[in-house]
Amino acid sequence: AVAIAKANAIAQGEPVRLAPVKGVGEVSWVTPILKNGMEVPVKEKADLLLSANAAAMAAGANFVNSQLFLINEQKYFASSDGSYIDQDIHRIWPNFTVTAIDKASGRFRTRNAFSSPVGMGYEYLDGGNSIALPNGLKAYNDRYDIVEDAAQAARHAVEKLKAPTVKPGKYDLVLDPSNLFLTIHENVGHPLELDRVLGYEANYAGTSFA
């Protein structure tokens, strides 16, 4: 960290003056969880993923790839302002990709899980608090049902496979927020990173227009 700070100082136009911050002393913080995913047996986790795979295959998928990410970070933050913060951070992310294939044409379509990485424990997977939407769809808030979503994803992939090709032309486009925030991330977020601010090489997404 010291070496990086010294290297960055070479390109520094003027001294950096940090805003005064009052130290919080010795404190600790733990992600509020109801069930520690690290303590759940591996077999139970594997069985859950296999159940999701089976549900997707039964609903029309040809392939399923599922994962369960569990992270427990132990962080200690110390600052010259007098803050010493011990952090115990938990994150969980169940994810999958289902694929439906038209064997006659070789075309295929996919759909990913509707889950999100969240700062919760294994209780995130208990399937409660789902939100019923039109046409039998379900959305999820602070709980998630990976088996139910996998079956729904397979049906969506099959529907996409049967959908007609869009004819060339100009259309009004309605973007889902999950697509829009990715567009903003790539085309605005990366161009505003340090290499672009300092006038260095263009980032991997291309030249900035932000």
Regions found by a protein language model. Give the residues of each.
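Active-site bordering "gate/hinge" segments
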Residues: A1-A210
